[in-house]
């Protein structure tokens, strides 16, 4: 009889392991991976899809199975092990009442160990590491159990719903649980550390998260750097400009840069000249296409949607007074995700961030404060300006080359000035000895 009971104990432990492994596997498996396997013709994946589509019901089935097998294991296992151990303690001349207690303690410990290790921990570990294989193997048996136990599962689920409603709580489906942006960032970081995604993928997805927070004024070409063409300029005069600037599109002004009336595409003008439709003595006014104007504080995601809708590649940004603050191109927006894009004419273009050494950089004055913070792991803040050059000017209004500021353990040095504009700033993280030396010099 005890042999039969031991076999039943082993079966109950195996069933516990089955339900535990099934529970963790169906939670762990990715829906996109299941869809891929179904597309490849994997029939087992269809059963997995059915289970994950009705996740709440099948998780309840797993919980019911674990509970039933655990109760059965406690009732049957402890009494069986206790009966097997009791004669051993009697032979050791342990008093009867004491041998019964010791047998019970040993039986309880053995069953608990087997239940936790063999029935819970080991299956859970396997299911987490091999979620795909486990879910493929166990999906069909789990469906059979669900069908058999459906009345009980239905009763338990509805009883749980009534209980939660009695406390004024709504039942939340497992499928309705969504990750916040911060949670997704943590998952992304962990996936990168574990090697599931590479550095480029990690960088792109992070940039997409940051994309929503970017404003047009943070990525614009400022008014002072806009190369615009007068609306009445001759094509021959335009040729002299485009040989130097080498842009494909130019904003067209009427009077000054505060009155941008449109944009021209050089390809369109040159094609018309080559075909003989116009002469080089004609003005560019007939080639002016509409351009959109938006406030400089517009989010770049909204601006991109508007540019796609209007089918334009350039937008003029206006300040609060209606003047031109700068311009943004589709390329500028895309670069916020994929990084810097350079064409065949950008060979001599200098990178905005040049690394000199460890913690030592030359920064373009137009680099955003947020980028500098991320680069150096510091927390510079200023609500009035967006760029590092602007930040320096708010700290020290009358600046000259080689002027320096120490902030957040870093030294910022004016590397180059272009008129009233900070062109380049050298920044380096200071060691503790350098910080102490600088502090002593300032006190002296």
Curated annotation (Swiss-Prot):
It is found in: Cell membrane. Keywords: CBS domain, Cell membrane, Membrane, Repeat, Transmembrane, Transmembrane helix. GO terms for cellular component: plasma membrane. Its main location: membrane. Residues 220-282, 284-344 form the CBS domain. It holds the Pfam family CNNM. It is a multi-pass membrane protein. One of its GO terms (molecular function) is flavin adenine dinucleotide binding. The keyword Oxidoreductase does not apply. InterPro entries: CBS_dom (IPR000644), CBS_dom_sf (IPR046342), CNNM (IPR002550), FAD-bd_PCMH-like_sf (IPR036318), FAD-bd_PCMH_sub2 (IPR016169), Ion_transp-like_CBS (IPR044751), Transptr-assoc_dom (IPR005170), UPF0053_domain (IPR051676). Residues 1-201 form the CNNM transmembrane domain. The chain crosses the membrane at residues 7-27, 61-81, 101-121. Belongs to the UPF0053 family. This is UPF0053 protein YhdP. It comes from Bacillus subtilis (strain 168). The gene is yhdP.
